[in-house]
Regions:
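NAD(P)H-binding glycine-rich loop region in Rossmannoid oxidoreductase-like domains
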Residues: 1-12, 17, 21-24, 39-41
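C-terminal amphipathic/interface module of NAD(P)-dependent oxidoreductases
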Residues: 196-232
Length: 232
């Protein structure tokens, strides 16, 4: 499809061409922002990915990112270019899109929200500031060479906790009440939003212990500070 061609052109082909150009011009290190989408969707009971988890992308975005990783690794062997791969989960900050933007909009509306029951799921995310800080560390740390790093805020949140943070920093008067999860799933089926509802209800966690240990790094920005900055 056209979409598939665009994903592979942008995420794979252009990335590989840029890396080849960098190597030919004497650039020493190449940091590639991949995605946890290379793991595919979490399948309960396994909802936590770590540095040793097998890759199994389930959409063209994840496939194109993984293909770029493989080709960059080959370029590193051929040219000596120091390649570092970072796999972030959802990245959030000002201008965030997707489900985070939707939740923010709902909370701003001050309408009652049926998400209180989604309080036991866990979602790993990373603020833009924490991601940038990790990239800075990877630029200079010799232990980063040839590594694949997962990144997050190291503070996983439930959907209910995310809504509470939005409420706090937006000054929202929305009441959050409980609706059984099966009703939310049914709404997703009826409205054709199954994947969006799944992302709201299910867990998806990344373990960043390898990143923290290898680079002696921890996320400098707290989740509270990140949310406060996001809704300014």
């Amino acid at each position: 499809s056209d979409d598939e061609q665009v994903y592979f052109h942008v995420n794979t082909h252009l990335t590989v061409e840029l890396a080849k150009m960098a190597a030919s011009r004497g650039v020493k290190r190449f940091i590639y922002l991949s995605s946890t989408k290379v793991f595919g969707d979490p399948v309960p009971p396994v909802v936590c990915f770590n540095s040793g988890s097998p890759t199994n992308p389930t959409d063209v975005y994840g496939e194109s990112k993984l293909q770029a990783e493989l080709e960059l690794t080959a370029i590193a062997k051929e040219t000596g270019l120091e390649v570092v791969i970072i796999r972030p989960p959802l990245v959030y900050g000002q201008g965030v899109k997707g489900n985070m933007a939707m939740l923010s909009k709902l909370v701003r509306s001050n309408l009652p929200l049926p998400f209180r029951a989604i309080s036991t799921n866990r979602r790993s995310m990373v603020s833009l500031e924490n991601l940038i800080d990790l990239v800075r560390h990877c630029l200079s740390n010799p232990d980063a060479i040839g590594q694949i790093f997962l990144v997050s805020d190291d503070h996983d949140l439930s959907t209910f906790e995310i809504i509470c943070l939005f409420k706090r920093y937006l000054g929202s008067k929305s009441i959050v009440f409980s609706v059984p999860k099966y009703i939310l799933y049914a709404i997703g089926c009826i409205t054709g939003s199954t994947s969006k509802i799944n992302r709201l209800v299910e867990s998806s966690v990344v373990d960043i212990e390898h990143t923290k240990t290898t680079l002696n790094w921890s996320p400098p920005q707290s989740v509270e500070e990140a949310f406060k900055n996001m809704v300014k």
